[in-house]
Design a protein with these regions (language model features):
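Short amphipathic alpha-helix that is part of the acyltransferase structural core
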Residues: 1-40, 133, 147-182
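Conserved donor-binding loop and adjoining core beta-sheet/short helix segment
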Residues: 6, 11, 24-100, 208, ...
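A structural microfeature
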Residues: 66, 131-132, 214, 244, ...
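Acyl-donor-binding surface of acyltransferase catalytic domains
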Residues: 71-151, 282-287
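Conserved acetyl-CoA-binding loop-helix of GNAT-fold acetyltransferases
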Residues: 86-98, 234-236, 240-257, 272-273
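Conserved hydrophobic beta-strand within the GNAT/NAT acetyltransferase core sheet
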Residues: 107-111, 229, 262-267
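Conserved active-site tyrosine of GNAT-family acetyltransferases
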Residues: 120-122, 271-272, 276
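A mid-sequence, solvent-exposed acidic-amphipathic segment
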Residues: 171-215
Length: 287
């Protein structure tokens, strides 16, 4: 091995890091997050990108073998590690503690349950698990079928950007906390121009008045046969009607013929009702 490291350069490293994540992907995230996880964040306005120079890449000659990075918040640190390079785990944990962002001295390490070498390194360095949860994944070997309730329909392509924005504003609780949506759609430009965007697969459900009331984004990742769903939301007054389940069934219908074998979900018990199974153990470590 000829191991070297340097800091992440956002303007030139993204595609190589994306390819690295494609190469090491496993369904239980034993080697780290899937590639669209980071691209979605970097393309979104909610991620603070002012500290990405703190992220670090390790190489074996010219091959990327490890990455330490943050997403949101900046104090949550993630680890991607190529199989065969577990010897770097302790160095990665030490770097995270020493150099990755902290606020008021606080920081968390996000280590997935299947990341055994990193878990052992964190324990050895005095970190302890604060809490965790299981993210659910839908196996496409089992058909996913849900019908839209009466009074709703799938929006025609291309989707209306403004309607998507307003749906997400309401669906993620911003209207209740900050007031009505202000009409700004500019922030969507980063997502629309992301290098691996597959927004043409996104699903929106509208009511009889033509308002979007449920939205499901799709980052189709053919190299991993992964249907990476992000985001998913329903406007509060239209919840508990089966809209999100119908949106996911439509994503299944659109991506399975492309070769998708599974779709990511989340930790909410709602996913259990649509046939998702716990697959990815999230664990948050503190000192």
């Amino acid at each position: 091995m000829n191991i070297t490291h340097r800091q992440y350069r956002i303007l030139s490293d993204h595609i190589a890091v994306y390819q690295f994540m494609l190469e090491i992907y496993e369904c239980d995230w034993r080697n780290g997050v899937p590639a669209p996880f980071l691209e979605y964040a970097l393309s979104s306005d909610w991620m603070d990108k002012s500290l990405v120079h703190r992220n670090r890449i390790w190489f074996d000659d010219d091959k990327i073998v490890a990455l330490v990075f943050y997403e949101n918040p900046v104090t949550d640190v993630y680890f991607s590690l190529r199989p065969g390079y577990e010897c770097l785990a302790e160095e990665m944990i030490a770097y995270a503690e020493t150099c990755m962002p902290k606020k008021e001295g606080k920081q968390r390490l996000v280590i997935f349950g299947a990341q055994k070498a990193l878990t052992a390194a964190a324990q050895k360095a005095g970190w302890h698990k604060e809490f965790g949860y299981w993210e659910k994944v839908r196996d496409f070997a089992v058909p996913l079928e849900r019908k839209l309730p009466k009074g709703y329909r799938f929006a025609s392509a291309p989707l209306d950007v403004a309607k998507c924005c307003e749906c997400c504003w309401k669906g993620f609780g911003h209207e209740a906390e900050e007031g009505p949506w202000d009409g700004d759609t500019e922030y969507t430009g980063g997502l629309a121009t992301a290098p691996h965007s597959t927004a043409h697969l996104d699903v929106a459900i509208e009511n009889e008045d033509g308002e979007y009331v449920c939205y499901a984004g799709m980052w189709w990742t053919p190299e991993n046969k992964l249907a990476y769903m992000e985001p998913l939301c329903t406007v509060p007054e239209h919840r508990r009607k089966g809209l999100a389940a119908a949106a996911m069934a439509e994503l299944y219908r659109r991506t399975k013929p492309l070769g998708a074998t599974h779709m990511t979900g989340g930790g909410d018990p709602f996913y259990d009702k649509v046939g998702f199974k716990p697959e990815i153990e999230w664990a948050f470590w503190v000192k």
